[in-house]
């Protein structure tokens, strides 16, 4: 029946601290005196009882009291019976014994304190044992162990239970009591900040909330938060902790003095005060010295250190803290390579701090420079995110099928899967998107890679380099970016081989315009016959195809068998329309979305027949012949689609613009070169038609005797200094020994100037024993050079949030996501007179509530006095 806790550690068999007689006297008093439960319910928790039966009886009394019912013997017996607990506590005899042994409830308050004391001693013993075990966990970093140990001891001092499952009825009772008190004006919903309109909108700062106050420099972020700290400390008499990572405590106190004494800070800094200024200064010093404001100006402080300081302050003051202010977020240390994820981890830790101490935590945050580039410089929620955004036409690769959807069409959706890169394994994995959203109109730049991949993004959007995530405005020409080496395909077949083959021919050389005969044009009779039979296989007797020789061409007309009327369409036109590719001119053509989600065998079939139209497979002559396969089209979208379909087969093709000066529309060539990619093309795509088959055979025979020379699928040379050299030092390997072990002639440091092939990277990784280099050599990524970054104007931009992996594939490039904001309340500051000297809002500051998890958003206006860096209330707006 005793409390189920582990109390080993001192090697004795002593019982844990407890007082059974006091527990029985308390319960007997509750059963005898209807007022007794009200005297102890606020100080005595259920878990304090050592005997489990006593916990059940006390819980029954608490439930009855909360419902306004008496706690006499009959009522408690009835409640225990209804909840099937009577037998477990020892039956009616147990309750009768408690009543018989109790004379009165006169000393119940003292007894409750005694039982709580024994409970806290037991908790202290439990915490001590757990701390002993923590001391042996040497794999954990010492600051983490110390923080966890401190947290366990701190938990013992708290009056409320620190953890465990709580029945919803208990929480509902507490909520109802709070609502009732607020309705009667007894209690405020949150901690008033002193600004009336802001309090009206937020209902005060709620305990356990993380609040972000953001703005560009000179908007008054620090002044605003110091005003909040001053107001809460002065009016609520609650301790306020200020952690200043940017300014010293002397500078902060000087600001508080200037604001409180109404003396310009310049006079305080110089010490040149007039006779009339000494009295308000003395009065301000007297008032501030009585306020419970505590400042820590340790630079680069961690959340763990803050938590420790805040716990200690709360224990010393003996009351809950009123506010914690952190100035500012970006200066905090998080211990990670990826700054975006590091800041996300910091904000989650701050949210945990707010919940643990039940105190509002305000973190100041610097907004990105993107605000300055806009015409309207009012900040938006998206400015707070560390990551940037993409234009609406950016194609996001979904999982598992590999459909590519414009990001603008995903806005408002969540819970769908995309392909993302696991940075630990450098393999593609499925990840779930939690949010897709627009972030407004912003300046964008077009980034183009050597392969011809293009993406338009804001300057602060991050891309993955060999050195980690880098903003677009930090990238340079010839720097390598991370791209997927292949895109996984779906195994669910929804189209037939005949359908995808016919589709390839019609997209390539078909005329499918409205009010025009559906026809296919080719120079080769075997291709004409192929289309003839494919059409019959797909549509059967519904069409009557015919081949018509015309000069040096063959036309295949795909006519409907039935006479066409207003309500009866050609079956071929109807089918193409259902796929979204009917009525397109050559420069408008693209691959239907449905094809992207087909198995690779069908994708190969489509490409094989498409290549027979405007594709080329040949050996380019000269002193040194070179094999090449390319597809030519005047449609940029079709070229991108073909490049993407090849990527699904593991073929990394390049996309090149081929200008047609004076000859018509520009052409786009999707080129396949290099032995590995051409081998894959021959194996997986192949050819159809006698002409293409002969050319393919020539290339096959050439490649059989060709030595592979890596110049595209490489690992950037930066890894020599980043990974290889440190690994060599750890295994005490010289440069000459490295050359010898990887089987290459000694060339000194010149070796480090060359990119690595995957084969060489595998050898080097084995020699220097580098798991990081081995992961790169076996990865799913392709490192592609940047060839240009150009400004593209302003446009509406969008982004995704991908919890966990924090990235996704857009336009066949690995890009970072926007991390979800953990804050419960986001406040942004804006002063129009800072940007516009002739504004009618001179002297006004806009406090923009951009996010409010439990209430409305909107804008509150305050007076801002720059002379004393002080925010003041306007007349009450009656919000």
Curated annotation (Swiss-Prot):
It comes from the Bacteria. Residues 502-651 form the DOD-type homing endonuclease domain. It holds the Pfam family LAGLIDADG_3. This protein undergoes a protein self splicing that involves a post-translational excision of the intervening region (intein) followed by peptide ligation. The keyword ATP-binding applies. SUPFAM superfamilies: Hedgehog/intein (Hint) domain (SSF51294), Homing endonucleases (SSF55608), N-terminal domain of DnaB helicase (SSF48024), P-loop containing nucleoside triphosphate hydrolases (SSF52540). One of its GO terms (biological process) is DNA replication, synthesis of primer. GO terms for molecular function: ATP binding; ATP hydrolysis activity; DNA binding; DNA helicase activity; endonuclease activity. Keywords: ATP-binding, Autocatalytic cleavage, DNA replication, DNA-binding, Endonuclease, Helicase, Hydrolase, Intron homing, Isomerase, Nuclease, Nucleotide-binding, Primosome, Protein splicing, Repeat. Its EC number is 5.6.2.3, 3.1.-.-. GO terms for cellular component: cytosol; primosome complex. It catalyses: Couples ATP hydrolysis with the unwinding of duplex DNA at the replication fork by translocating in the 5'-3' direction. This creates two antiparallel DNA single strands (ssDNA). The leading ssDNA polymer is the template for DNA polymerase III holoenzyme which synthesizes a continuous strand; ATP + H2O = ADP + phosphate + H(+). ATP binds at residues 215-222. Residues 184-451, 614-878 form the SF4 helicase domain. Homohexamer. Belongs to the helicase family. DnaB subfamily. The main replicative DNA helicase, it participates in initiation and elongation during chromosome replication. Travels ahead of the DNA replisome, separating dsDNA into templates for DNA synthesis. A processive ATP-dependent 5'-3' DNA helicase it has DNA-dependent ATPase activity. The intein is an endonuclease. PANTHER family: REPLICATIVE DNA HELICASE, REPLICATIVE DNA HELICASE DNAB. This is Replicative DNA helicase DnaB. It comes from Nostoc sp. (strain PCC 7120 / SAG 25.82 / UTEX 2576). The gene is dnaB.
